[in-house]
Amino acid sequence: MRVDNAIIMAAGTSSRFAPLSYEKHKAMIDVRGEVLIERQIRQLKEACIPEIYVITGYKAEQFEYLRDKYGIKLIHNPDYLIRNNNSSIWAARSILANSYICSADNYFSQNPFEYEVDSPYYAAEYADGPTEEWCMTEDENGFINTVTIGGQNAWYMMGHAFWDRAFSERFLGILEDVYNDPETAGKLWEKIFMAHLDTLKMKIRKYQPGMIFEFDTLNELRTFDDSYKNNTRSVILKKVSADLCIQEQDIVNIQPLKSGNTSASGFEFDSPFGHYQFFYENSTLLRN
């Protein structure tokens, strides 16, 4: 079947990517010389995907230039701070058909997208040994029949998915039924999928290691792009390193500090001189 469009989800705050995600949306981070979301848009266009939609929320204004540069369309998700990514699926409900469902912060070393796709699937890589990722098994027909959070020696969810028109209609029907339930707000769309494997038929698209990357933290990005070890492109981290008279690479183990909702109030980190906290609102640096 021919692909109708691609939905790139870019509404979330990516608080674990502190402090870079406080200064700039994670999708706008430069990775190996390319803006993360621009690389994905180019790969979709190279595959001749006719329509590309970006679902925005946090720092939505940073995506405006993509309209003119690439001819993509933006859809705003007003609930990005109070709901998980099921709200981005809901925001795109009128355009879901034969659709790629993508995350703005994935990096594909090779182009995984195709103009024609046989059936719905979720991209996966294989874990040798234990993993905390979402692991899948398949039945004799190749359809996903179990999904567990954590496992070992298993294929795990990594990257994009493809929904055909029938899958989209079934999923949206289920989502509509549960959307206003309080427990739904915090769920990933994948969690809803897990609860309906009997009716939401999807296969595993298996990729070799080194094909799909995601960066949840600065440390993970530094492993992939070592230029970030001593040049984080972060005004905040440059100020911190100057104030402490250390190199940026000496700022490690960064963790967000939450302020009671989904946004971060600052971050904590380790340095050669001890453990510190930095607060965004007043640019305060405190040693613990």
Where are these regions (language model features)?
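N-terminal nucleotide-binding beta1-loop-alpha1 segment
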Residues: 1-22, 71
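Nucleotide and nucleotide-moiety/phosphate-recognizing core
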Residues: 46, 52, 60-68
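Conserved beta-loop-beta/alpha segment of the NTase-like Rossmann-fold superfamily
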Residues: 64-134, 140
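Conserved core of the sugar-phosphate nucleotidyltransferase
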Residues: 109-184, 255-288
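Short, non-transmembrane alpha-helical segments in secretory-pathway proteins
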Residues: 231-251
